[in-house]
């Protein structure tokens, strides 16, 4: 298996960094089916998605494991931001880039979304008909986690309190220009 680091932009002008895995005995004159692999929330392409990419390349696919916008070696500020629009667009930008490679069969491009990227991959496949196959692994519904807390841990009262805090923080940011960045995982579940 050969690995090539590649860079390409999404429609939000964010530079994405990916690793393309080519199968053994790769022949640039042939047309290959391709798989785009999305990583778990908080991970990078060299971890889980890279392992899936290696295994699927071993099975004859050209694979692309990318760092999502704001993560790893990809661009985007502030770092570690979760933007559903950008993360869904990252899959379509990956389809764009792969489909421009002369050795890719444009009618055989699929996606594997792992954990947090699973939900974004489902959304991408529903919006982009160029994605011909979809698989998710341990898919996590980020929308539900945002609305209800991890493991549905928030009560209605806690949710209303959090929304009030978010509203107040938005006013502070509008007044001062200073963003408050916090990570979404509570210290105790």
Predicted regions mapped to residue ranges:
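Active-site glycine-rich loops that stabilize anionic/oxyanionic intermediates
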Residues: 32, 39-44, 115
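The serine-hydrolase catalytic nucleophile loop
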Residues: 42-54, 68
């Amino acid at each position: 298996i050969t690995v090539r680091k590649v860079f390409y932009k999404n429609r939000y002008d964010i530079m994405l960094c990916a690793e393309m895995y080519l199968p053994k005995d790769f022949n640039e004159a042939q047309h290959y089916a391709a798989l785009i692999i999305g990583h778990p929330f908080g991970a990078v392409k060299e971890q889980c998605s890279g392992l899936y990419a290696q295994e699927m390349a071993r099975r004859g696919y050209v694979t692309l494991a990318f760092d999502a916008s704001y993560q790893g070696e990809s661009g985007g500020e502030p770092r570690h931001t979760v933007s559903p629009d950008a993360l869904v667009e990252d899959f379509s930008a990956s389809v764009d880039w792969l489909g421009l490679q002369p050795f890719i069969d444009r009618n055989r491009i699929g996606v594997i979304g792992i954990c947090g990227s699973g939900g974004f991959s489902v959304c991408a496949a529903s919006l982009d008909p160029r994605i011909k196959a979809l698989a998710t692994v341990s898919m996590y519904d980020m929308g539900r986690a945002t609305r209800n807390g991890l493991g549905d841990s928030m009560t209605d009262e806690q949710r209303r309190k959090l929304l009030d805090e978010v509203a107040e923080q938005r006013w502070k940011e509008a007044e001062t220009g200073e963003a408050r960045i916090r990570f979404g995982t509570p210290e105790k579940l």
